[in-house]
């Protein structure tokens, strides 16, 4: 797994440094906006993201602001700053800043003929939130791959990622998770597209206090995209568990995306 992480980091660092690009680098494929799955697209956007979860031990809401900027035609960097609200079933509610994340993504292949693309990247999470107050405090590295293709009025996206906790002071084995998801959207109108996602999470390493180690969580996410204004998209959906292995009973996922 260390070799996989090093290979991903090498691609992310080396590929953007190549000065020669194809003539169509200023063109992009306009895939829809999924709710969990990553997009293989270089973006210039400002986004407001909201996630509300209801679990057995209480509720939590995360409101995050993210900016995505292209550094080079095939290299993008994203910074996300979250504000977290925690309302436990027992104990006092808390609120504050969560863990800031920084993501680097490289478009390694794209075909305008087939409307297909592949991207590789890595996300780093900084432990800026308070672990004691339940607002974060996790340092992690997450290499990922994303792919997409458009066929007629349908977009198909998929992504896979491996998250590794790197907190130095954690007792016992640091947690690691494999995430995989796929999303399908139907462009019934230029301003509206219903979507459906399937997401899986498998904890491969870490403690087993909640009984989720080596068990695969499966979630289904129905939702939609709506083009509410020129260059502005609303995405909204509900994440529902399909297995007894779960971290929450449901989650409401949403966001406003502003292209600039």
Regions flagged by a language model, labelled:
Residues 1-28:
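Cleavable N-terminal export/targeting peptides
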Residues 22-260:
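Transmembrane beta-barrel domains of Gram-negative outer membranes and organellar outer membranes
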């Amino acid at each position: 797994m260390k070799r996989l992480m090093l290979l991903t980091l090498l691609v992310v660092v080396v590929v953007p440094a190549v000065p020669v690009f194809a003539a169509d680098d200023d063109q992009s494929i306009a895939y829809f906006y999924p709710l969990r799955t990553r997009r293989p697209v270089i973006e210039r956007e400002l986004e407001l993201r909201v996630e509300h979860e209801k679990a057995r031990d209480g509720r939590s809401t995360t409101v995050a602001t993210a900016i995505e900027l292209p550094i080079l035609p095939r290299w993008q960097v994203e910074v996300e700053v979250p504000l977290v609200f925690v309302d436990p079933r027992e104990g006092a509610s808390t609120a504050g800043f969560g863990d800031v994340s920084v993501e680097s993504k490289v478009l390694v292949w794209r075909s305008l003929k087939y409307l297909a693309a592949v991207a590789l990247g890595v996300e780093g999470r900084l432990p800026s939130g308070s672990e004691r107050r339940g607002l974060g405090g996790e340092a992690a590295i997450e290499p990922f791959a994303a792919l997409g293709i458009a066929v007629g009025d349908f977009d198909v996206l998929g992504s896979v990622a491996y998250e590794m906790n790197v907190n130095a002071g954690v007792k016992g084995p640091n947690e690691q998770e494999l995430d995989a998801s796929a999303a399908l959207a139907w462009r019934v109108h230029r301003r509206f597209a219903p979507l459906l996602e399937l997401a899986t999470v498998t904890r491969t390493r870490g403690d087993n206090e909640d009984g989720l180690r080596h068990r695969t969580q499966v979630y289904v996410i129905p939702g939609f995209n709506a083009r509410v204004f020129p260059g502005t998209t609303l995405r909204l959906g509900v994440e529902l568990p399909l297995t007894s292995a779960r971290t929450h009973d449901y989650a409401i996922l949403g966001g406003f995306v502003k292209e600039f």
